[in-house]
A protein has these predicted regions:
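Extracytoplasmic
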Residues: 49-53, 71-76, 85-87, 91, ...
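Protease-domain processing segments flanking chymotrypsin-fold serine proteases, especially trypsin-like
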Residues: 8-11, 20-77
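A conserved glycine-rich beta-strand in the N-terminal activation segment of trypsin-fold
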Residues: 40-42, 61-93, 136, 226, ...
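Serine endopeptidase catalytic core focused on the charge-relay Asp
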Residues: 130-201, 231-232, 241, 253
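Catalytic-histidine neighborhood of serine endopeptidases
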Residues: 83-145, 242, 252
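Active-site region of chymotrypsin-like
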Residues: 51-71, 155-161, 188-273
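Soluble periplasmic/extracytoplasmic beta-strand elements of cell-envelope proteins
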Residues: 53-57, 77-81, 89-93, 107, ...
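N-terminal Sec-pathway targeting helices
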Residues: 1-15
Length: 274
């Protein structure tokens, strides 16, 4: 009888441990990645740095029986890396803007209230269309699906800071920061480390070719595509294009196109536009 009780006890304990590993640990890991905080980074986050980041919102127009309707997604991310007068050039992911021929992409800058905030504080009703009409539309400059990267341009009367691109890929375990727009949350900061010692071949669900990337553990989610990955010098070391999630949709890792490949992509962009 005692032997049987021992076996049952071992089985129950094992089952509990398995359940903890499957259900509890991934949730704790996601929480840690989302709430991790690097004080030395946070001191360098100025309004200028934040203003270099943008929300890229897809606007689709549909006409049915002479009735025109518009729809907007939650938005993705992008970062300014170059400028000419009041024209600014931003990096984002190719899959964010791949429908450029059939849709418009609206640029929402840092510091602007969301539609819900705008509506709540307005004395008169404002439609979605009225809200989005106040923002600039992006122009596609260059895109390459083999990198899952794109360059877009937009106008801004406000002077924006141009963030430099780092020359060398980040090292394994190097500290990083991501500024992105996960699930509609605007300009969210997440912190982490580079998890790759070499290139990781990432295959997305967007029917794009495999892309050479680096893994990291700074939190990201849907809407983070195209977002910037910064080092301690506030240099661009990567652009996020996706990541891994478990069967319960919990964060496992992010993937970014590292800066050496970004520079390679921009060389092609310059050649294409000369």
């Amino acid at each position: 009888m005692n032997h049987k009780k021992i076996i049952i006890t071992i089985f129950v304990v094992t089952l509990i441990l398995v359940c903890v590993c499957i259900f509890a640990y991934p949730s704790l890991y996601e929480y840690q990645c989302k709430n991790r905080y690097f004080e030395n980074f946070s001191k360098k986050i100025t309004n200028e740095i934040l203003e270099s980041n943008i929300v890229v919102v897809k606007q689709e127009k549909k006409i049915a029986e002479d009735i025109t309707t518009f729809s907007w997604d939650f938005g993705a991310s992008g970062v300014v890396f170059d400028s000419e007068d009041n024209t600014y050039y931003a990096l984002t992911a190719y899959h964010v803007v791949k429908d450029f021929e059939n849709a418009d992409y609206i640029i929402i800058p840092y510091g602007v209230p969301t539609y819900s905030e705008y509506s709540k504080n307005s004395k008169t009703h404002i439609s979605n269309q009225m809200y989005y009409e106040q923002f600039e539309k992006a122009q596609l400059v260059f895109a390459d699906e083999t990198y899952d990267l794109a360059v877009i341009s937009f106008k801004s009367e406000k002077k924006l800071k141009v963030l430099p691109i780092c020359e060398d890929n980040p090292k394994y375990n190097e500290a990083i920061m991501v500024i992105s727009n996960p699930e509609g949350e605007r300009f969210f900061h997440s912190y982490g480390n580079i998890c790759s010692k070499d290139y990781y071949i990432f295959e997305s669900n967007d029917e794009l070719p495999p892309v050479s990337t680096f893994k990291h553990n700074a939190y990201e989610n849907y809407g983070s595509s195209g977002s910037v990955v910064l080092n301690k010098k506030m240099e661009i070391v990567g652009i996020n294009i996706g990541g891994g999630r478990d069967f319960m949709n919990r964060f496992k890792y992010g993937v970014m196109v590292p800066c050496e490949l970004i520079s390679e992509f921009l060389e092609k962009c310059n050649q294409n536009n000369t």
